Amino acid sequence: MEARALEHERRLAESHGQEALKHAIAAAEIYMRAAEKAANPKDRNRLQRKCSDLIALGERLKANAKSAATSARSPVPESTRTLTIAEKTLLLKSSKLHGNIFPPWEKTPASDEFAASKAADGCFTDHSPFTLSPEQQDIFAGWKRPHEIFMDVPERGVDVFMTATESIDLGQDLATDCSVVASLCAAVRQFGPRTGSLLSSLMYPYDDDVKRPAVSQNGKYIFRMYFNGCWRKVLIDDRLPTSSSERTLYVVDRRNPYLIWPALIEKAYLKIRGGYDFPGSNSGTDLHALTGWIPEQIFLQTDDIELNETWSRIKTAYEQGNALVTLGTGKFSREEERTLGLVREHDYAVLDLRNDGNNRLFLVKNPWRDSLVWTGVGSTATSSTDRSGSPEESMSNTFWMTFEDVLQHFDSLYVNWSPSLFRFRQDHHFTWTIPPKAEELVFTQNPQYSILSHTGSPVWILLNRHWQDSELDILRERKQEHDFHQPLKSLGYMSLSLFASHPPGTRIPLSEGSHHALHQGPFVDSPNTLLRYSPTPGVAQTLVIAQSDLPLPSYSFTLSFFSNSPLTISPASDPLPYNETITGAWTRRTAGGSTVYPSYVTNPQYALTLTRPSPLSLVLSTERADNLPVHIAVLYSNGGQRVTAVVGRDLICSSAEYQRGCTFASTLPSSNTSNVTSSVASNNHGHTSSSLIDPGTYTIVLSTYEPGQTGRYSLRVSAACPFTIEPILSDAAGRLRTPAPSPATFRQGEGRVRARVDVARLTRASVLARSVKTGSTTQKTAMVRVALELGTIEGRKRVLASTASGGGGELAASLSNLSLSERLGGIGGIGGGHIHGGQGTTEGDGYSAKGEFADASLGLRTREVDLDPDVIRVYGGLWLVVEQIGGGGQGHVTEGSDDDGGGGGGGGGGVHVEISSDGVVSIGEWEVADED
């Protein structure tokens, strides 16, 4: 049944008029019957919502058919989604701005609200403060009403204040709001006196008979503007800032200086932006607030812009009255300004788009009065066709420019699209507490949404960040510090990206790796950003909101989804429901580096205990400024004990090789099989399935690539069952580190040295050893073995502990040697309680056989053992033994040599050995101890 409804939805997206109405009704009826038969409450609610959306669309389609004869403008979709209490509260809180209240729009004001009888003394006064810049204050002559400014009102009376000539030629003088005036210049074609004029629904009072704004008898004007998540009511009076000179402080029509409605629109907008000393914006943002049209910023200096497609879609929409176009320049020198005739970091209006032979042309207007005009230097235009004659071309400061020249000299192309291009709209409002710096590079705390479409019809998603007083404070502070260039960048950046996740529509941990990015939007310094895409029918996808350097602790946002077929949208859920985030730091003591260093075991470690079989996901991130290469390893370690020696078979899963800033490890199936970023290892401890880890306790090791790389981190762990995670104390916590008096070295023909070890009481200890190469790098590496031995008499000697054959290097080797199938294959579980850390465990006697020789440059370590002074006396002493084979003479001291100890174990620095213990240990001098 639902499949039939989806087919009607598909046809609905492709049809218009009565045909579209027929499919909307048919789909709604099917969903209604399906909802009645649904046994699952969740399915019933989903089907009822789809039915309600289609009924609302049908009502709009019927209303559109009735009004088609009287309206020249297509209907605008409205969000039919029911807001939560939290969302309604958010919108009310966002009404407060700059000491004013801008309530959500409720209804069109009655005409008598503007009567003289409704105001004291017949004149309404808005006491809201409007700030001015120092330059404006120098010539400010007070706030005056139109009849006070224009003492010589023409005979036709006050109507001249609202009556425009055939073409309006707007310009700014001492105003600082170039983007606002450019926006008004571009919007004039939609504000003109005609049926369907945008002004009829944006400015009050409005005279529907003559299709233009009306003069308010009491000086009150009400504007309907879109900002902070909804249409809002903006109230002003008719007083304008006047000047003591010939300069003007508000936008003026050069062809009719009496025309004031553009100046009133400007005043209303500057009221919501903080005053006439407006620090700056962009015209796409301004037009979105003034008209509600969808803003898109196209970056012209990128390599991936499709010129033909971009020109075609913009020109078509512009000619149909569905697009407003403006331009913005970037940074260049004063000399380039004079040469090109373009103002740097300035917004321009586009008044026309035209094809002229092989040239694609923009008619561009500089909103500044008496300012620079494009000189054409370096122009690629080849046509000499006369393009004069239109009213727009006769305006001041206008010039034609080819698309290629626009690409070369402008940074941004702003297009505001009519929402009437779409039939459906959903608005979602939310507050986001900005995560700490250590989590800025990952998405663990980012808002994410699941989007499901049953058709391939295009979807547009607009993210709007609500304005706050604190942002204006930041901009003004930067301006006082003379940081005039790109002031918006001090407010941070944001972006939208779309991902294919597993399971579909669930949250993702970070932008790279096992989650395939379908669309990644740029980070923009604007409060609006747009993502356009064509969905995969029937497959939920994940939308992620990201930010960089947003300076305030929290923000409110609105997501608006536009489409021509219904969408199912909800906050994305976690694929694993149990989560915990812990924070910590790599310090000088705990930044042990990668597995090639013996200090790897000093890295931060955590004991993770799972209560039942579960997949596992881990996300590690650092502060952006640190940009450290980081890694995660999950290891079997005999009940979550601290890892003291790493062997490959203990690896459960790990992240990809060291990645800067953040990384991710997971046993969940990947949605991006072409880009594997975490390793899942098979081992000999048993397993339950390809994605489940057996119940038990594991050790997590967090490392940077090099020892000594310090910085803060955040680790988020997720599982399908309850779990606990606790830090494992470092070996250095409450322990003594006793180095041997000197490195162990070997003379020619020697292969074994030893040093006596003494303890006064029962002591738990382990041995760490590392060779340091200071000799020739071409010498053959020697192999080393280190042990703690009881006694010296053959037959009675016992090896208490010996370094393992793998040492610190085996984990790295095991990761690099895993095949792709092994990385994607089954994950091991946990076996029985056998002891790790010393090879060749002898069951029952508590002693170990000697480990295999290994490259000590990777670091070697024994397991922990108990040193009992009584036992040591019985055996005749305890010895720290270092043995070497190979090396081609490395580390030897020959007769007569000035070198008193070469290196051993692969270099001239010898083997550096120390004992880590919970009690006092003494180590004697080295002596030769070759066995017979």
Swiss-Prot record:
GO terms for molecular function: calcium-dependent cysteine-type endopeptidase activity; cysteine-type endopeptidase activity. InterPro entries: Calpain_cysteine_protease, Calpain_domain_III, Calpain_III, Calpain_III_sf, PalB/RIM13_Calpain-like, Papain-like_cys_pep_sf, Peptidase_C2_calpain_cat. Its EC number is 3.4.22.-. Residues 902-911 have a biased composition (Gly residues). Residues 890-932 are annotated as: Disordered. Gene3D superfamilies: 2.60.120.380, Cysteine proteinases. PROSITE patterns: CALPAIN_CAT (PS50203). The active site is at C178, H346, N366. Required for the proteolytic cleavage of the transcription factor pacc-1 in response to alkaline ambient pH. Belongs to the peptidase C2 family. PalB/RIM13 subfamily. This is Calpain-like protease palB/cpr-8. It comes from Neurospora crassa (strain ATCC 24698 / 74-OR23-1A / CBS 708.71 / DSM 1257 / FGSC 987). The lineage of its organism: Eukaryota, Fungi, Dikarya, Ascomycota, Pezizomycotina. The gene is cpr-8.
